[in-house]
Amino acid sequence: MSHLRQIAVPVALPVPAGDEGGARVRRTPRLRAVETTPPPLGRVDPARRVLFVTSEMADYVKAGGLGDVAAALPRALRTRSDVRVLIPGYDEVIAGAPDLRLVGRVPARAGIPACDIGETFAGGVPVLVLVCPGLFQRGGSPYVDGSGQDWSDNAVRFAALSRAAAVIACGNAGMEWQPELLHLNDWPCALAAAYLRWYGSDVPALLTVHNLAYQGLFPLEDAAVLGVSPEQAESITFHGRLSFLQAGIVHADHVNTVSVSYARQITGPEQGCGLDALLSGHAASGRLSGIVNGIDSSWDPRTDLHLSEHFDLHRWEGRVANKRRVQRALGLPHSDGPLFAVVSRLVHQKGLDLSCAVAHQIAAAGGQLAIIGGGEPRIEAEVAALSRRFPSCVGVYPGFDEGLARKMFAGADFLLMPSRFEPCGLSQMYAQRFGCLPIAHATGGLIDTVEDGVTGLLFNSADADSLRRCVQRAFRTYRIPGLLSAMRRAAMLRPSSWDLAGTEYLRLYERVLDARVPELQA
C-alpha cells in the first residue's frame, strides 16, 4: 500500500424613520453590543469518543460550507472530547498527509470494495482517512467531475464512506479506538445510521443536516450493490429512489440542523423538500433541533493577513483603506457613497436575480455594487451585463479569490444576502465580524444571526420590491453616522465563535447518549 506506513493492527474486527421595509422579526428598542463567553457546560465526560464523519474538510478539500464546519467544529471540541474525523482519501487529502499511517481496514461487502484506514492530524485533531484509490483518487471535486456532472458511482463512493463509519463503530475495522457516538454530516455519510442499525450496533448516531435540498438520490437498483436488502431498502426509498439523506433521518437517533429557525422551517412543506412529514414527527418526539454554526477565529479585522489595513472598534480608518482597495480591484472609481457587496455562489438559491434587480437603484442613489463569485452560466452572464451597463457603479470579479473576498467584507458597508432559503449562512457572520452590515432575507439562519436594526437589516419576502425597500433603509442608515457606527459595533461584537457552538454540540452529544441508555435497558 503506497500511501500508508504499515504498523501493527489488532486482528479483531434603533432604526431611522420610515423603515416600513423592515422585517417584523425581532424589534429592539435600542442597540446592544455585549461580549459574552460560553455558558458553563454542566456534566460532560471529556473522554467521550466521537467519530465526526464528513465528505469534505477545508484543511484538504472544500466544496461548500460543510468543509468549513468540518475543519472548525472538531477543533473546538478537541480539548473537551475525544473527537476524530473520518474523511475520504481524495488526492488532496493524500497529498496533504505525508505522515499517513495505517490503523485499520474495512472489508469488502457486496459491490463496495475493501478500504484501508489511515490516520493523520489536522490542527491537532486526529483525522482518519478512508483510502480507496479507485473510489476517491481522481480529478474534479468530491461530488462532480471536471465537466460538472455527478460522478456516476457516487452511490458506491459514499456508501463506502458510510459503511466505513459503521464498521468502525461496530469495532470491526481492526482499530484500537472505537467511538461511542457517530456524528454524521449531510447525505454523503447519512447511510451510516442505517448500516449501524442493520448491523445490530448500539452506538447512537447524530445527523447534522447542512442543506436539506441535497438528498443523495440514486436508482433503486443500486441497493444490492450497496449491500442493502429489498426489505431494508423500504425505509430509505423516496419516490421510487434510494435516498441517503432519508436513511439518516429515519435511522439516526437525533437530527439537527445548522440553525434553530431552519430546523423549524423544514417541518413545513415550503422548505421540507418532501421530508417535512418525517421531520415533523421528529420534532414532535424531541428528535429534531438546531445549533447555529460559528466562524473561525481567523476572521479578525485586527490581524487578518488578507486585509490592506487592519482596524478595530476604536480605529475605523482601516475600513476605508480596504474599501479603496476593493474599488480599485473591481475597476470602480473612488466614491464616498455606500458600497454594497455580494460574496456568494451565483445560483438561484442565493437570490442573485434580486441583487441584480436593485443595481439600478443603488447606482441612481450614489452607491456602488461589488460582486464576487461564480456559478450558473445564466446568472454569470446577467451579472457581467450589469457591469457593462453601469461601469462606474457595478464591479464584478468572476470566480473566487479568498483575499479579495475578505477585503470586500472589510471594506463594504453592506452585504446583500437575499437568499430564498439559508440553512445557516456564514457570509453574514463574516461580514458582521468586519463591521459590514448584512441586508438579508428573514429566513433560516439569517433570522438567528441578524438582528433587524441592530446587527443588520432584514426583509420578509424574497422579492425585488422588499429588497428595494430594505436598500432604501440602508441608504438612510448610512446617512446617519452615529447610527451606522453603533450598528457596526453591535455587529462586530455579536458572539459567533465556534466555542459557543461547540458547547451546544457537547450538550447535544450527552443528550443523544443519555437517551440511548434507557432505550437499551427497556
PLM features per residue range, with description:
Residues 2-522:
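Catalytic cores of nucleotide-sugar-dependent glycosyltransferases that transfer UDP/GDP/TDP-activated
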